[in-house]
């Protein structure tokens, strides 16, 4: 529901900035960190008062850098050659970048998202044996749910009715269900199931959903 900013120094204790909701959750973390209450990360309409320091003041205390590089991690990496705004391209909110540039030289900022998310060497591709087992288990459960949904399709059934056959449970999801009938609904790409659309013979059918570690989606034509 709100943003969080983690600052990892080369040496010393990490710092984390959390909003109104995060301040209640951070206490359960086993990692020793400097916790900073920063209400600007909270939802609009929630309290944002004098209990929070200004961002520049917080970052000055947490960052001491005059040489080397300061890695900024957002959602994606970008090839500077494809842009016209210089070597540093990031999707981290502009007000955070502007504040950082008041503390450290702008030329020291670098998009470091690739360290986590690069498709070849990013940390997300280095998984433990336990994680491999969990992903395999999740893949089996999701694929069986999609298969069960397809096997129980009947003419006149709504997309919403069909979605109930996906064997959902409370495991963490990475996307909403996509159960769609007919050219129009399938063409929407990632549409949620509706109660209005009813299945007819000869129609295209798409069925899929995802849980943490796996996503399965199948498309075919419904025939007897």
Model-derived features: positions:
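Short catalytic-site patches enriched in acidic/histidine residues
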Residues: 1, 104, 110-126, 157-224
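A general structural motif
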Residues: 1-3, 13, 65-69, 202
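N-terminal accessory/capping or targeting/presequence segment of soluble
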Residues: 1-53, 197
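Acidic, His- and aromatic-enriched active-site or binding-groove loops in soluble protein domains
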Residues: 5, 95-99, 202
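Pocket-edge structural micro-motifs
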Residues: 8-10, 18-20, 74, 181, ...
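Short, acidic Gly/Pro/Ser/Thr-rich loop/turn segments
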Residues: 14-15, 23-25, 78-79, 212-215
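Flexible, acidic/His-enriched mid-domain "rim/lid" segments that flank
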Residues: 43, 47-175
């Amino acid at each position: 529901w709100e943003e969080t900013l983690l600052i990892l120094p080369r040496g010393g204790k990490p710092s984390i900035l959390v909003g109104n909701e995060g301040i209640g959750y951070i206490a359960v973390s086993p990692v020793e960190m400097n916790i900073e209450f920063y209400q600007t990360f909270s939802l609009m309409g929630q309290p944002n008062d004098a209990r929070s320091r200004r961002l520049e003041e917080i970052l000055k205390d947490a960052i001491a850098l005059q040489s080397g590089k300061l890695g900024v991690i957002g959602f994606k990496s970008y090839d500077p050659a494809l842009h016209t705004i210089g070597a540093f391209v990031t999707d981290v909110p502009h007000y955070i970048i502007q504040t950082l540039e008041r503390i450290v030289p702008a030329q020291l900022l670098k998009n470091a998202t690739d360290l986590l998310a690069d498709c070849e060497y990013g940390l997300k591709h280095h998984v433990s044996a336990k994680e491999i087992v969990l992903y395999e288990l999740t893949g089996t459960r999701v694929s069986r749910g999609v298969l069960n949904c397809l096997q129980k399709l009947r003419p006149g059934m709504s997309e919403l009715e069909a979605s109930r056959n996906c064997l959902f449970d409370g495991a963490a999801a990475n996307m909403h269900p996509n159960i769609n009938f007919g050219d129009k609904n399938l063409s929407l790409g990632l549409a949620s199931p509706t109660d209005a659309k009813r299945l007819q013979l000869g129609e295209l059918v798409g069925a899929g959903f995802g849980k943490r570690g796996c996503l399965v989606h199948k498309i075919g034509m419904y025939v007897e």
